[in-house]
């Protein structure tokens, strides 16, 4: 077994979801990591901070000596046992620290002395992160970017999920992109969003598609920001427009904004707490667009929401939510979409219903 995994292997280990042991401190891991990694630190946050302070004041040798003093005996054995337990479940794991330096080498040595082998990754987290950032920057030159646009509720995300040549940006951001797009689970950190986007793009490139199909998004998907160079490529790309009649859009939005959302909240929090959280989510979502709506229209929508919630709670009937959804489309989402589409009409190369969109995409696959 090789003791060091070279940088030339970064793409492979990410594509195959290689199990990774991250020996950085928890505070480093929380800021950003990789989806198939587990944090089993060599040093905890406080220990790392003490070693860092010592390094600045007294130099490397003193810092290393302090590290050994802090992580010895029972503490050291606990760290080793955690690594060995992970390796017994995933013997094909690699380990990494921040730069592929002393922490990686020391962890590898202690594991080896305990009777098991594990390679560490050259360059560590920092180098893999640079590789992923470069992957995002290069992606628009690897496959032609194609944007799927469509009015709110047209089912763009469903089409994205049905196409092999797509990358689901909203799925990676864990947010549906609108004021009502927040999910019960938190969004990833910005760094993790970018890391996951890069891995998704690597997998897309491996399949050698002619197009990179992306849903039309703002630069911010919730609080996840698309990298500037990548978003700039999206802003210049050709657009295909998905048409969908209002009578098909309304039930889809009722499911997205109300039925599925309430199910998620109740499942996560229990019936009463879930309903209260769902109610707060609707109020907060409306509040997020209050300035654009104006006070009068915001209040009109909030009154309709309150009435729909009362009917839902007393009669177990969600249909009254269609009143405010319909009005929201009429006074806010539809005019905004049509205005934005008009500004980029010169980039639209095809427009049609779902079947026509799929036929067009199939025709232009190669």
Curated annotation (Swiss-Prot):
Has keyword Transferase? yes
* Enzyme Commission number(s): 2.9.1.3
Q: Name one GO molecular function term.
A: transferase activity, transferring alkyl or aryl (other than methyl) groups
Can you tell me which residues form the catalytic site? 97
* InterPro entries hit by this protein: P-loop_NTPase, Rhodanese-like_dom, Rhodanese-like_dom_sf, SelU
Which transformation does this protein catalyse, written as a reaction? 5-methylaminomethyl-2-thiouridine(34) in tRNA + selenophosphate + (2E)-geranyl diphosphate + H2O + H(+) = 5-methylaminomethyl-2-selenouridine(34) in tRNA + (2E)-thiogeraniol + phosphate + diphosphate; 5-methylaminomethyl-2-thiouridine(34) in tRNA + (2E)-geranyl diphosphate = 5-methylaminomethyl-S-(2E)-geranyl-thiouridine(34) in tRNA + diphosphate; 5-methylaminomethyl-S-(2E)-geranyl-thiouridine(34) in tRNA + selenophosphate + H(+) = 5-methylaminomethyl-2-(Se-phospho)selenouridine(34) in tRNA + (2E)-thiogeraniol; 5-methylaminomethyl-2-(Se-phospho)selenouridine(34) in tRNA + H2O = 5-methylaminomethyl-2-selenouridine(34) in tRNA + phosphate
Keyword Transferase attached: yes
Q: Which family, according to UniProt? A: Belongs to the SelU family.
Role this protein plays? Involved in the post-transcriptional modification of the uridine at the wobble position (U34) of tRNA(Lys), tRNA(Glu) and tRNA(Gln). Catalyzes the conversion of 2-thiouridine (S2U-RNA) to 2-selenouridine (Se2U-RNA). Acts in a two-step process involving geranylation of 2-thiouridine (S2U) to S-geranyl-2-thiouridine (geS2U) and subsequent selenation of the latter derivative to 2-selenouridine (Se2U) in the tRNA chain.
Q: How does it assemble?
A: Monomer.
User: What is the name of this protein?
Assistant: tRNA 2-selenouridine synthase
Tell me which species this is from.
Shewanella frigidimarina (strain NCIMB 400)
Query: Could you tell me the gene encoding this protein?
Result: selU
């Amino acid at each position: 077994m090789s003791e060091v995994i070279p940088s030339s292997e970064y793409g492979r280990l990410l594509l195959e979801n290689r199990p990774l042991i991250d020996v950085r401190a928890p505070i480093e891991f929380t800021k950003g990591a990789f989806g198939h990694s587990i944090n089993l630190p060599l040093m905890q946050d406080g220990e790392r901070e003490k070693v860092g302070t010592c390094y600045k004041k007294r130099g490397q040798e003193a810092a290393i000596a302090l590290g050994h003093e802090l992580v010895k005996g029972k503490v050291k054995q606990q760290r080793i046992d955690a690594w060995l337990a992970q390796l017994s479940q995933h013997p094909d794991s690699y380990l990494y620290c921040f730069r592929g330096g002393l922490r990686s080498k020391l962890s590898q040595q202690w594991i080896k002395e305990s009777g098991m082998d594990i390679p560490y990754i050259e360059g560590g987290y920092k180098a893999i992160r640079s590789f992923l950032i470069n992957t995002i920057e290069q992606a628009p030159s690897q496959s032609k970017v194609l944007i799927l646009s469509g009015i709110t509720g047209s089912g763009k995300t469903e089409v994205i999920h049905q196409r092999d040549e797509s990358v689901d940006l909203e799925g990676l951001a864990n947010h549906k992109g609108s004021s009502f797009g927040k999910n019960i689970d938190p969004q990833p950190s910005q760094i993790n969003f970018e890391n996951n986007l890069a891995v998704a793009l690597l997998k897309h490139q491996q399949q050698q598609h002619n197009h990179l199909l992306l849903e039309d998004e703002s630069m911010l998907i919730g609080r996840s920001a698309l990298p500037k160079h990548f978003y700039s490529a999206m802003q210049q790309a050709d657009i295909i427009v998905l048409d969908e009649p209002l009578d098909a859009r309304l039930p889809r939005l009722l499911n997205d904004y109300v039925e599925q959302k309430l199910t998620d909240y109740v499942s996560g929090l229990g019936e009463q707490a879930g309903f209260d959280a769902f109610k707060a989510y609707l109020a907060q979502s409306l509040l997020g667009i209050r300035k654009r709506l104006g006070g009068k229209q915001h209040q009109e929508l909030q009154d309709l929401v309150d009435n729909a919630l009362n009917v839902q709670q007393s009669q177990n009937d969600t249909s009254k939510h269609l009143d405010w959804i319909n009005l929201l489309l009429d006074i806010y989402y539809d005019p905004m979409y049509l205005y934005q589409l008009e500004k980029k009409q010169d980039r639209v190369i095809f427009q049609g219903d779902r079947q026509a969109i799929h036929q067009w995409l199939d025709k232009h696959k190669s």
